[in-house]
């Protein structure tokens, strides 16, 4: 994904949702402690380093030693190495990795469910790692955007296979184990994870269809506003490249 430097981008909707949640965490705590964030599959720190820069204590769990090395380097460069903890492991080991502190204030599973062998077990592990009343944020590859993208690229046979496949894959060479639609993600989090879904948004609904930033002083801002609205509006929301869901673990906050 290439950010548009001159104006807010589609990723801002996800980042804003996380900031809102963390502001609520700080308010409940009276500002007495840094929010605890657990980023599962967080790799090189795309989300972890900015969150640490916002004052969070972030633990990143990833199976790749190389990605975690990049994370440590980025955290040092950003001056937040003391607020980022890197742990090599996978979602199956969350129960052993988590501190005995009652769970995280925010759990991220961004770009995770596409790759795990057992998404039900993964979602249950994410839910179990969140403190009661805390949020789980999931970002997963959207099925319908992948179909349309292949049609536009002239890869019609792949689009047909992807549309017909129960897991939303285009073939044996597909690097993803699955893609999902909004109903599938919601059911996975609610039915299998025991979470309460609060927000479902499309992430990059229309922005990827625009070859360049629109002209004019308000062009980029207009695109960002359109993207924000489309991400909340079915059926456009359901055509997004990725689906963002914020769900909450039941319990007192």
Language-model region placement:
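Conserved alpha-helix/loop element of class I SAM-dependent methyltransferases that forms part
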Residues: 8-33
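Conserved class I S-adenosyl-L-methionine
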Residues: 33-41, 135-164
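Class I SAM-dependent methyltransferase SAM/SAH-binding core
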Residues: 46, 50-93
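A conserved beta-strand element that flanks and buttresses the S-adenosyl-L-methionine
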Residues: 108
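A short glycine-rich, Lys/Arg-flanked "PGG" loop and its adjoining helix->strand segment in the class I
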Residues: 120-135
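Short alpha-helix
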Residues: 174-193, 200
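Conserved Class I S-adenosyl-L-methionine
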Residues: 199-253
